[in-house]
């Protein structure tokens, strides 16, 4: 089980609802992923009438927990306003907080992120902040009251996998009581397994699934990879070594194999 604030879930895969070729493929992908939490964009919901209504109806039929986000927001004021609108629309205090600094890299504005998180937490929100892998930023978010931290593995949609493994491992080591979710930059099931092997609590995926040739199949693949990676972490992974170590004991080796 993984805990997000006061709620527990069986699946460690969170999934986004954007970029799918069709609504039916989105539904199939969410189902096959086993995800219990789906992120949705307020901008999509308010963009226009019937399209938004149909989309929301499809999400509701899946019986999942909705995590609205502030995707596309580029200022503290915009992010806070969007979060408040999302709380009214979706009737939840959860918000995936994004404050973007650069249009090309979609890198988080970490200064604005901490400021927005502080404002929202004081207003009763339970914040899921999308941030870089910088420990000092993560610590400031924790100090502000965030119980969940969502660092990127690489830039959004890049499919590069974990770029700074050491920094992510440091986050896990230094924030043992915080729920850590790798968010953005993963492209293959093996990337997700690696994140879980580092001890992260969950993974959020969207582009890697939605843009796959067969999204629903890819969703199932990520599900299995995340389960395998977590199980490996819980089993206690053997650390790397600089030299070979025989798996067969040398005791009892025949004399003719002995080194003179």
From Swiss-Prot:
Alphabetized Pfam families for the sequence: ThiG
Major place of residence: cytoplasm
Domain of life: Bacteria
Pathway: Cofactor biosynthesis; thiamine diphosphate biosynthesis
Disulfide links within the chain: none
Family classification: Belongs to the ThiG family.
Subunit structure: Homotetramer. Forms heterodimers with either ThiH or ThiS.
Name this protein carries in UniProt: Thiazole synthase
Species name: Rhodopseudomonas palustris (strain BisA53)
Record lineage: Bacteria, Pseudomonadati, Pseudomonadota, Alphaproteobacteria, Hyphomicrobiales
